[in-house]
């Protein structure tokens, strides 16, 4: 715009700020700027009230803001720096660096509100993204350019699994990653940053060689920031996809907080709540974000999203709305974590669209279904075992139970990022070895080995070595 229109603050209620303009009103989603305690405060237009007033959502704290303060219309939506200048850096929702490493320098900017790619631009090929984590690669494989949801209640290991995926894929992957911390713990964000420095994902001495950009809007931020920080992260990922033409990884921890912040904003704007108190625009908000995460002819964005499940209820509107957009779901189960099996992935609840013989091949598909079949048989026998004991089972069922218990333990795996908890080095297992190992267990080739040998190891060779160690200790 040639001349920036000026307005003034007329009302401040928490994160909602009303601004009066005597000239024309700025369009919905435009960014307005004012000064608060000597710092730039960005407001996003959410509603038009009458002929001269707009209702806006603040992207930072409004303490100290006064009525009558001057507000400037920037003439465009919130725009953030993108490209190589952001690598190795931590940005906030409006693209300001918050890692005390100085300015970003010359960087091109991009608006955080973008249309989703058109049908003509989208790519439709399916290819497996190997993570090195056995239970995921075998039973619910991730697709390149797909959307993956990590579902779980509080404290079952969503963030640890995301950190392991970043660790594994950054080591073997030449592409870029973007991590959006949406409404999660600042301490975890800090830990993640320092672990990335230690593992070499962020090169602190030469930031331009780093492989990841971080965008944080944590729990202590106002709802406006938490509702927009996922879009800021996605905008960075879109730029990397378009400029490099490679597979970009986009991690969101936690997508539920995006919905939660949207609910807070909706209530502040006076909208009538929908089911369970969520915003009436829940599906629209989620769709606007998720439809932008896709593969185009230029490259792809593979998204891994941690999804907190309130009270472990998968039918809650927030996780239920996320389900519709996902290609693969990794469900983390409290019952499995209580057995000490980590990652606590539920092998029967977790699903993947690409677990199809035409995509992963006949052998992989058949082994995965055989593993699930044995585990399902064990699950259906558990009531009988609890009431009558193992002795009442047929010989065939006893064998199924023994194999299922070995498979259950074999699906556990030590992680690099969890070394501080377990004391053992993490392992990444190639897909071919995962398939071959489970095929042998299903076929009964290792029925003679003890259950304990299958716990927290890599492939079948590690099981044999552990069994020999256990036998030597017992002797």
Curated annotation (Swiss-Prot):
UniProt EC number: 7.1.2.2
Sites where the protein binds ATP: 152-159
Cellular location(s): Cell inner membrane
GO CC, alphabetical: plasma membrane; proton-transporting ATP synthase complex
Keywords: ATP synthesis, ATP-binding, Cell inner membrane, Cell membrane, CF(1), Hydrogen ion transport, Ion transport, Membrane, Nucleotide-binding, Translocase, Transport
Pfam families assigned: ATP-synt_ab, ATP-synt_ab_N, ATP-synt_VA_C
GO molecular function, one term: proton-transporting ATP synthase activity, rotational mechanism
Chief location category: membrane
Topology with respect to the bilayer: Peripheral membrane protein
UniProt cross-references to SUPFAM superfamilies, sorted A to Z: C-terminal domain of alpha and beta subunits of F1 ATP synthase, N-terminal domain of alpha and beta subunits of F1 ATP synthase, P-loop containing nucleoside triphosphate hydrolases
UniProt xrefs under CDD domains: ATP-synt_F1_beta_C, ATP-synt_F1_beta_N, F1-ATPase_beta_CD
Reaction(s) this enzyme catalyzes, per UniProt: ATP + H2O + 4 H(+)(in) = ADP + phosphate + 5 H(+)(out)
PANTHER family: ATP SYNTHASE, ATP SYNTHASE SUBUNIT BETA, MITOCHONDRIAL
Homology family: Belongs to the ATPase alpha/beta chains family.
Function, as annotated: Produces ATP from ADP in the presence of a proton gradient across the membrane. The catalytic sites are hosted primarily by the beta subunits.
Record text on subunit structure and interactions: F-type ATPases have 2 components, CF(1) - the catalytic core - and CF(0) - the membrane proton channel. CF(1) has five subunits: alpha(3), beta(3), gamma(1), delta(1), epsilon(1). CF(0) has four main subunits: a(1), b(1), b'(1) and c(9-12).
Official protein name in the record: ATP synthase subunit beta 1
Organism annotation: Cereibacter sphaeroides (strain ATCC 17023 / DSM 158 / JCM 6121 / CCUG 31486 / LMG 2827 / NBRC 12203 / NCIMB 8253 / ATH 2.4.1.)
Lineage, broadest ranks: Bacteria, Pseudomonadati, Pseudomonadota, Alphaproteobacteria, Rhodobacterales
